[in-house]
Amino acid sequence: MLSRSRCVSRAFSRSLSAFQKGNCPLGRRSLPGVSLCQGPGYPDSRKMVINNSSVFSVRFFQTTAVCKNDVITVQTPAFAESVTEGDVRWEKAVGDAVAEDEVVCEIETDKTSVQVPSPANGIIEALLVPDGGKVEGGTPLFTLRKTGAAPAKAKPAEAPATAYKAAPEAPAAPPPPVAPVPTQMPPVPSPSQPPSSKPVSAIKPTAAPPLAEAGAAKGLRSEHREKMNRMRQRIAQRLKEAQNTCAMLTTFNEVDMSNIQEMRARHKDAFLKKHNLKLGFMSAFVKASAFALQEQPVVNAVIDDATKEVVYRDYIDISVAVATPRGLVVPVIRNVETMNYADIERTINELGEKARKNELAIEDMDGGTFTISNGGVFGSLFGTPIINPPQSAILGMHGIFDRPVAVGGKVEVRPMMYVALTYDHRLIDGREAVTFLRKIKAAVEDPRVLLLDL
């Protein structure tokens, strides 16, 4: 009796294990006949068959891994030290299914926008911050229920196949009967009576339709309001602070672009073939600015108003202004003094592409010791840029236009560009500013100055 009980238990465990290993749907299954064989160590045990009449029925439940149904809370990512808070703009709503790394919301800070992706596949259960609400680093944003599988993409509905039966061909219509040939001339029609006319005195003038009001013809005059985004608010605040803090002064000069245009036209194909980059004018001005900043380090310095000290930087990080739909951003090219033209062009292209795609990180815009703004790409002729604090100067580039200039006692038409240097007159004197701008002019007009370190 003991051996039979053990064999039954062993066989039942094996059957149950086999059922559990199979990925069976929810249901009820009955064990078929279970054969119990004589096992070793039990010589007295006999073979026994348990029929289906014996109730060995097991109900199976399909289970899911615990991690698939976990509810997690996603928090605001940490910001840079110079950023304390941001505004939330939701891309998804409650109940939306999201895939891993799919953007759920965007946090707009003073300098850039930070995208918050979903950490896993799941369904959004709750939004913990309203749209447009302010959040700090580590603030809970939303809760997500993991599903373990990416949401299936909706397939386009297929048009139902309709069986069309060929319509039976209609019998051919009989030919029309032949019209009889006329044997007599048709009668000549008599002229009709002219229509009766009214006398002029009987005609009464009709009133002209009233003229439409002048206001209705021009349309309604309306206006609407939009909330300033955080980046625009920060730009306005910083520029006003710069005006209130710095004693800004602007000096001008003009640059003959003939040599740099000739150099670009001669070497642009070889430059593109070797570096896979287009050779532009921006790299020439960035390189010339680094050369001039090394000659005039005070332009690369800044006043620390808290300690009343002048901070001289031994490195050159140049901010390049880039216009985006959200506003003006200034990504930084670091250690420009160690770069060549190809390195500068590559960095400008990478930062510009990230700015247009709104993928700039805060670290890409932190720092900067000098700024270059190129209004010439929009056709600017002249302008005075505003200092980007905490810097002490900014260079403004403008459009290239053919103008008559005196060259060797003769009038020639040359491609000319106006350049402007706005600087903090509290730190930089006029002599240093003019010398700095002339260094840039010399390096751009004749790039050999950079090679010879003149």
UniProtKB/Swiss-Prot annotation:
Cofactor: (R)-lipoate
Pathway note: Amino-acid degradation; L-lysine degradation via saccharopine pathway; glutaryl-CoA from L-lysine: step 6/6; Carbohydrate metabolism; tricarboxylic acid cycle
Chain segments carrying region Disordered: 148-227
Entry keyword Acetylation: yes
Example GO molecular function: acyltransferase activity
Main location: mitochondrion
Transit peptide: 1-68
Active site: H425, D429
Note describing how the cofactor binds: Binds 1 lipoyl cofactor covalently.
Sorted UniProt keywords: Acetylation, Acyltransferase, Lipoyl, Mitochondrion, Nucleus, Phosphoprotein, Transferase, Transit peptide, Tricarboxylic acid cycle
GO cellular component: mitochondrial matrix; mitochondrion; nucleus; oxoadipate dehydrogenase complex; oxoglutarate dehydrogenase complex
Biased composition (Pro residues): 171-197
EC number, as in UniProt: 2.3.1.61
Compartments in which it is found: Mitochondrion matrix; Nucleus
Cited SUPFAM superfamilies: CoA-dependent acyltransferases, Single hybrid motif
Entry-annotated residues carrying N6-lipoyllysine: K111
Occurrences of domain Lipoyl-binding (ranges): 71-145
Modified residues (N6-acetyllysine): K155, K268, K273, K274, K278, K308
UniProt keyword annotation of Acetylation present: yes
NCBIfam families attached to this UniProt entry: sucB
Function, as annotated: Dihydrolipoamide succinyltransferase (E2) component of the 2-oxoglutarate dehydrogenase complex. The 2-oxoglutarate dehydrogenase complex catalyzes the overall conversion of 2-oxoglutarate to succinyl-CoA and CO(2). The 2-oxoglutarate dehydrogenase complex is mainly active in the mitochondrion. A fraction of the 2-oxoglutarate dehydrogenase complex also localizes in the nucleus and is required for lysine succinylation of histones: associates with KAT2A on chromatin and provides succinyl-CoA to histone succinyltransferase KAT2A.
Quaternary structure note: The 2-oxoglutarate dehydrogenase complex is composed of OGDH (2-oxoglutarate dehydrogenase; E1), DLST (dihydrolipoamide succinyltransferase; E2), DLD (dihydrolipoamide dehydrogenase; E3) and the assembly factor KGD4. It contains multiple copies of the three enzymatic components (E1, E2 and E3). In the nucleus, the 2-oxoglutarate dehydrogenase complex associates with KAT2A. Interacts with ABHD11; this interaction maintains the functional lipoylation of the 2-oxoglutarate dehydrogenase complex.
Family membership noted in the UniProt record: Belongs to the 2-oxoacid dehydrogenase family.
Protein name: Dihydrolipoyllysine-residue succinyltransferase component of 2-oxoglutarate dehydrogenase complex, mitochondrial
Annotated source species: Rattus norvegicus
Gene symbol of the encoding locus: Dlst
